[in-house]
């Protein structure tokens, strides 16, 4: 009896569910071109981020976003309706992204007159690759030593301040900008989509990437950690000119389709609008904890708004003195240097980009590398520079002379011996080497001033003692005709008119 009562109830539930499903399946018919057919939440629910729930709350779908980012290149015409746009890029080519302020009057007043920070990333679109992102990027680093995945084209950019590129995060760049001013950043993507395909037999499809922008405002402590807005877009990167060919091929294919088939596809838009997304989950860690070698000092490179050229010369970056806490800076790499000291030496000698490649290398390991080894690891330019630095090679000066300062006491001793008829060849002279590159009187004056610990302005003239004791004024041409490793005794003579001195080379 119990079974007889439950069966009709179950049938009614199943039948009711089928009716609801059928009604839901018909609800979209005739609305394909309507406003309700395209749901932003559907796009944001794509498996494009590492977090499972990446779609935004439904109540925020219709709000006006504070910022908008526009990638100034056309979208692909071969994308179906309700699918996310896809944009093709050429490897290494500079593409403009416009940073637009969409705030209403009175909205976010705390940003007025303030800067915000934006962090750009190129990440994987496919979830399968997201799970192995670290291994994928490490493999790319080994195959392309010294290269970056993402770069800023600073000369072409406008309005960006303090651009930075962390040498340990090849796919990330960041900068500050003023929302009230025109801001455009030109980015370059150096990896291509086919570099991350599983099977490489030729003709395979490349994996899609995402370019994501996260923007933050300053908190009470002056750190840019308060999230304001995030947006991203799907891209594919081809070898140079490959994106143009792919765009042309897609356009020709669409032209061959019937009008009914074309209605199923989106038109190609002249620009790509980045759509809102969830912030990158590790952004606060990256922002607050730069890795060794990431220059966290505020050496800004403001970009002018007119022609994109810097409005003043940037200050030279401060030398890195303490890379590893508790270590004293070392000048030369020794065979006994520990891996930590080797890392410090790499940073001090401007090889921070390769520090991760040589993480476990001791001083002996680095010094054993051949010229071919370092060129293969670091590329020709940086490889030769690293090899010369490891071997301690110093550029040979164009001219070397040896000088000795003749003291008053030594002069009196020589004069006394001469008056008494004693031989004067027992004097002991200590010489100093002077290395000249430009071989000019100005350079010689500066080097002699350093030797005497005086200002170059205190040296009036430099003479060379000639035949019969005459004083010949030193000129650039005379210095250029000095014999290499010539020896001179320096004598000083007070100038007649001021507190300066004449130097005589004997």
Swiss-Prot record:
Lineage: Eukaryota, Metazoa, Chordata, Craniata, Vertebrata
Name of the coding gene: tfcp2
Keyword DNA-binding attached: yes
Domain annotation Grh/CP2 DB: ranges: 61-300
Region called Disordered, residue ranges: 238-268, 291-316
Alphabetical list of Gene3D superfamilies matching this protein: Transcription Factor, Ets-1
Keywords, sorted A to Z: DNA-binding, Nucleus, Transcription, Transcription regulation
Annotated signal sequence range: none
Region (DNA-binding): 133-395
Annotated GO biological process: positive regulation of transcription by RNA polymerase II
Family the UniProt entry places it in: Belongs to the grh/CP2 family. CP2 subfamily.
Biased composition (Basic and acidic residues): 241-265
GO molecular function: DNA-binding transcription activator activity, RNA polymerase II-specific; RNA polymerase II cis-regulatory region sequence-specific DNA binding
Stated name of the protein: Transcription factor CP2
Major subcellular site: nucleus
């Amino acid at each position: 009896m119990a079974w007889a009562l439950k069966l009709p109830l179950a049938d009614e539930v199943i039948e009711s569910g089928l009716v609801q499903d059928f009604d839901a399946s018909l609800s979209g018919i005739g609305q394909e071109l309507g406003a309700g057919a395209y749901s932003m939440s559907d796009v944001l629910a794509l498996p494009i981020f590492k977090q499972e729930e990446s779609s935004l709350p439904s109540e925020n779908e219709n709000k006006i976003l504070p910022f908008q980012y526009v990638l100034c290149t056309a979208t692909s015409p071969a994308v179906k309706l309700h699918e996310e746009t896809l944009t093709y890029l050429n490897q290494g080519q500079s593409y403009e992204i416009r940073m637009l302020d969409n705030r209403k009057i009175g909205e976010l007043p705390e940003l007025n007159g303030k800067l915000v920070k934006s962090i750009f990333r190129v990440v994987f679109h496919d979830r399968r690759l997201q799970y192995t992102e670290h291994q994928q990027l490490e493999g790319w680093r080994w195959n392309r030593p010294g290269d970056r995945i993402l770069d800023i084209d600073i000369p072409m950019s406008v309005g960006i301040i303090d651009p930075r590129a962390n040498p340990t995060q090849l796919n990330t760049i960041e900068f500050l900008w003023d929302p009230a001013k025109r801001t455009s950043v030109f980015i370059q993507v150096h990896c291509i989509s086919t570099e991350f395909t599983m099977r490489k037999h030729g003709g395979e499809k490349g994996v899609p990437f995402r370019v994501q922008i996260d923007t933050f405002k300053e908190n009470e402590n002056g750190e840019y950690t308060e999230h304001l807005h995030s947006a991203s877009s799907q891209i594919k990167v081809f070898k140079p000119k490959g994106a143009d060919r792919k765009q042309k091929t897609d356009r020709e294919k669409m032209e061959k389709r019937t009008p009914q088939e074309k209605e199923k596809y989106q038109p190609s838009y002249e620009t790509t609008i980045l759509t809102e997304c969830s912030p990158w989950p590790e952004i606060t860690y990256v922002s607050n904890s730069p890795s060794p070698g990431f220059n966290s000092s505020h050496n800004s490179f403001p970009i002018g708004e007119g022609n994109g050229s810097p409005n003043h010369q940037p200050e030279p970056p401060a030398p890195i003195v303490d890379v590893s806490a508790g270590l004293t800076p070392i000048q030369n790499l020794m065979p006994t240097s520990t891996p930590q000291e080797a890392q410090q030496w790499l940073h001090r000698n401007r090889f921070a980009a390769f520090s991760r490649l040589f993480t476990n290398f001791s001083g002996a390991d680095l010094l054993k590398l051949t010229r071919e080894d370092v060129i293969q690891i670091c590329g020709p330019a940086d490889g030769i520079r690293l090899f010369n630095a490891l071997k301690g090679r110093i550029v040979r000066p164009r001219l070397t002379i040896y000088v000795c300062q003749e003291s008053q006491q030594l002069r009196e001793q020589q004069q006394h011996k001469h008056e008494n008829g004693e031989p004067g060849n027992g004097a002991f002279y200590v010489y100093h080497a002077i290395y000249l590159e430009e071989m000019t009187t100005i350079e010689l004056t500066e080097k002699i001033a350093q030797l005497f610990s005086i200002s170059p302005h205190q040296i009036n003239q430099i003479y060379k003692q000639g035949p019969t004791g005459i004083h010949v004024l030193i000129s650039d041409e005379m210095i250029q005709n000095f014999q290499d490793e010539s020896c001179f005794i320096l004598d000083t003579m007070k100038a007649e008119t001021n507190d300066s001195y004449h130097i005589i080379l004997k």
